[in-house]
Amino acid sequence: MSKRYRRAVAGCSNERIGPGRVREPLSPRENHALDHAMQNGYVPYQDDRWAEACEIWLPLWERFLEVIRSRGIRGVDGLEVGPDTVYSGLQAFCNWFQDLADALENAAVKDPSWWPKVLEYSKEFRERLPESNGLHLVNMAVLEARALDGIGRRAEAEMTLERTVVEYPTSEWAWASWGDFWSGDDFGWSGAADREKARAIYQRGLSAGVEDPDILLERLQSLAQGPEPGTQETPE
């Protein structure tokens, strides 16, 4: 079974809506249209028909972006939380945007022509919703790195991962992803492994005082057991 890294699922953010900030809710008709498109995409998504789900959901993402722009929303919660709820559907936006990220990555693994879309989505999310939950932002930064790696910009991918641990030094997932980049285990990254570099990164994460050290300790234990069959090491 593949150990390919999947983003940790996060709850919603706690964006603060200042006094006097009132956001107009969507009309029942608009709300229904967005919810209907979201549910339509879950049909292929649940059958692992990733590209088909993305074809339905990417236009929906653009529609949500218009709502986000027009109402000055800065974090995921701004759509669904508080007295002035903007959107309400069968599936929470907070869950759906993570499912779209998952669908895009899986579509790109199967068909690399999707990687530019993955890159666009991950960057757009962080630009438009910078006050979201920290784990959401870490996940999107890692997704951006995955996309850069997927289109052959490996050096930029690592720079993105390194910036992420600087910005989120206590995030075990930020450190884990950077170490995974070099581990050679089946986490979906390209390039030859440098297991000593991976080990050093995991250990730096532990020294930084990450919130859940077990994530990194498990990876260090895996490295200690030796490379997986077929792992290509970087020549010394």
Which residues does each PLM region occupy?
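Extended alpha-helical scaffold segments
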Residues: 1-12, 24-27, 31-49, 54-67, ...
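Helix-turn-helix repeat elements of alpha-solenoid scaffolds
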Residues: 6-18, 52-79, 110-123, 150-158, ...
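Flexible helix-coil transition and linker loops at the boundaries of alpha-helical arrays
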Residues: 22-28, 64-93, 107-112, 124-137, ...
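Amphipathic alpha-helical repeat scaffolds of TPR domains
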Residues: 29-46, 58, 87-109, 123, ...
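Eukaryote-biased recognition of C-terminal alpha-helical segments
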Residues: 134-151, 155-156, 162-164, 219-232
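Long amphipathic alpha-helical scaffold regions
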Residues: 167-209
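Terminal, low-structured helical/coil segments at or just beyond the last alpha-helical repeat
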Residues: 197-236
